[in-house]
Amino acid sequence: MSKLFKAFLAAAAITLAIIGVVVGTREGMDIAQRTKYPIAYGGLITHYAGENDLDPFLVMAVIHVESNFIPEAQSHVAYGLMQLTYETAEWVANDMKVTYDYDIADPETSINFGCYYLRHLINIYENIDTALAAYNAGMGNVNSWLSDKQYSDDGVTLKVQNIPFPETRSYVEKVNASWEYYRTTDFADLDEDRGKIR
């Protein structure tokens, strides 16, 4: 083998190794992002978001922060993908005139009721951050904050950085960060995704 040919093979091997590292890094980054920002239930999300005139990526962000797409998730009083309390679910069921037995831990019920409730809050507050704060901390707390100049300049919009509950402030920030990720990422097969976490 000539020295020139050996040099060519060495250069080709180095080039292929670099390409492999770049491609592997991109795939590794994609896997890391999908671990940090999973998606599931795309068909249900797009369906119920559409029924309630919501951005499906906002709904994905709420689910991500509330339950990380784990349908069995529960806190001390909230259950399911969208972490509804029994009281909220009962209000939604009555307002929607639901006549069947429902399980708020069921993914479809959770997404259906959660989207309906989120739309209700957006209609009331006419501001997504304020609606998200109400979704997390309750309407009573948000109404109190809106009437206090420390938390709202106009009585309509909360100053997110001044929300007095650290959990709620963090919640609004996390939902917005997740929403930004989901709406700027290509999910070509979102409608076909019926529950598989990717």
Where would I find each of the regions flagged by the language model?
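Hydrophobic membrane-insertion alpha-helices, especially the h-region
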Residues: 7-25
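Catalytic glycan-binding domains that act on GlcNAc-containing polysaccharides
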Residues: 23-198
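Short, Lys/Arg-rich N-terminal segment immediately upstream of the first membrane anchor
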Residues: 1-6
